[in-house]
Every structure is written in C-alpha cells, then in structure tokens.
C-alpha cells in the first residue's frame, strides 16, 4: 500500500547501528534564543546569523545525532511529531547531500517562524480530490513538507493506476530541497517533476524590479528496485539566493554574471545583488522557465504570486504562502514497457565518457563521504538548535 511504502521509504533513510546521544540536562533546561537574535527585523542582508560566522569552529555529527537534533528542534519550537517526521528526513538528506546552507542553516529560521507565528507546525493539511488524478492540498499556512507528504499518499496510487497524476499545494511554506520530494516519487517507481515559487528576486529582461523568484525545478528518473537513475534539482537563476546571502555574511565577492544591482547593472558585490536582482540561468531562457514555474505554482495552484507572498526573512508573523506543483507519471505504462532499458542506454551514453557525471552524482559522493566523516555543523548554530530543542 502507499502508506506502507511511505513508512519503508522513511525507514530506509535511517542509518542503522548508530547510537543516539542522550540530550544533556543543560540543553533540556536551556531556553530558546529570542527570535530577534536570529532574524533581522530591518532585512539587513549583512547580519551575522548563527552558523555563518567566518571564525566559527565545526562539530561533526553522526546521522543519528543529526536526526535527533533536527527532530528535537522542530518539536521544541512547536511542530507536532506527525508533521516533524518527513520534514526531519528531508533536512537530514539535505545535509548528507553536502548542500551546506540549506539544511541546518535554514532550520533555525523554521524554528523562529514557529515561535513568531509565521508558520503553524501542528496544522493538518486538507486534501481535495478534484478528480481521480488531480489533487489540491491546502497546507493551511503550515509547513510544506507535511502537506506534500499527505498529498503523495494520493498522488502515488493515482499515478500507478491511471498512468499520470498531478498535485498542487497552496497556502504553503518553503519546500526546501525539491530533489528530496521528486526523489521520493522516483523511489516509488514514478517519473517525477516538481517546482515551487518563492519571493521575487529576478527582474524581467531589461527591467530592474524583481517579479519572480529563483523558482527551483526538479525532476527525478526512476530505476528498477526502488532506485533513482538520476535526479536534477536546480534554481532557474545562475545560483541560489542562499549563495549570495552566505557570500555577504562571509565578506566575499561574487563573480560578475550572478547578480545585478538596483539599477540593473552587473555587480560582484553580493549585498548589492540581494538588494537588486539575480541573473536567470541562461538569460532570457532561464527567465522564461522561471515564469513557467510561477504559472504552475501560483495561477494553477491558487497560491499567491511571488510578489504577493510574505517575507521569509522578516519576523512579522505573516504567512509566506508559497505554492508547489508536482507531476507523477507511471513510466512502464506510458512507454510500452521499455522505459528502464531506454534509461539504462541513456545513462551509459553519459557515464561511458571520461570526465562526465550524471546529475546528482556529486550529492551521492558527498553522502558517502559524510557518512564516513560525520556531518559538519558550526558550534554556534549547533547551540542555537539545541536551545530550540
């Protein structure tokens, strides 16, 4: 059943044989830091956030220690146990993929948003079956992850039975690493596409006022026996917004071609890029893809346009209201049974060439390395998350 698949999927992500550290009495007694210490109320992109100080020292966590820290921080800040499970695995998967700055770093924001009322960690998403293959999920201003997981319980069996199924999510939140969600569907044997809109940081070609966000897209290709042949997960801008933000916090410049200043001129100053706009990947073509994402994730879902969404940075208690779109296709039914063979040939045509790699290969290499070495987390950020826990 679908429920059994979801349980098995989450269990398979767990790393056996690793002991959990007991939470110390001191961390249990510690109080969550004031939200104002974590978020800039005046949206100053130069603010030093926990976990980004240049001089911070790193700790290294086992996957089980990291899982416990993530889960306990979410619960401590006000997430229900049911809503925290899938979310915890997504954040852990992000860290194990080596996507530094997208896992632990954003978790402190998630916890702060819980305390400020920007997101509801306990709400139960509402599912509306528009037809046998189309589903709308109202996240009800809660986290995206529980809403996506709840929707997948309908999307997966519908795609398996009918060959294709679509799901939209509205009144939602940051979907974080999209590849976790599309990979989830691919491991269920489905060809998957996902997208999300976010707050505007990209101006239209020739303009200087942002109208769409980095608007990431992801697709995942299934392989036999619950594996993933390859997976693509990328923003529709040259780099992610987090990359610019981290450059500001670390006092680094950026290459020309990543961002524009407020007048629409190229800049190597990441702070000017954050107050100006980001460059779409491939110029006009990248903007067009970002525009498609905006249509799929706002007009089609019933969610707000990026220009109408709440701020992820400002601590104002206002919901963010992102939208998400997912498409799942049963590949054997649609291909006449030759999908796996064709994908195998496609993969071989790439990997047989020297110096090439499949999309997502680096993340898999990072996973193996971090399973051996431990997952790094800066001491200050670790203490912040422990306090939330």
Where are these regions (language model features)?
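Catalytic-core signal marking the mid-to-C-terminal active-site face
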Residues: 57-61, 66, 76, 300, ...
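Small-residue-enriched flexible segments
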Residues: 241-302, 319
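Phosphate/diphosphate-binding glycine-rich loops and adjacent basic-rich segments that engage nucleotide
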Residues: 202-271
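A generic, well-ordered mixed alpha/beta core segment in the N-terminal half of proteins
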Residues: 135-224
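Short, Lys/Arg-enriched N-terminal segments with co-localized hydrophobic residues
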Residues: 37-54
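Short, well-structured alpha-helical segments
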Residues: 81-92
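Active-site cofactor/substrate anionic-group-binding motifs, chiefly glycine-
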Residues: 105-152
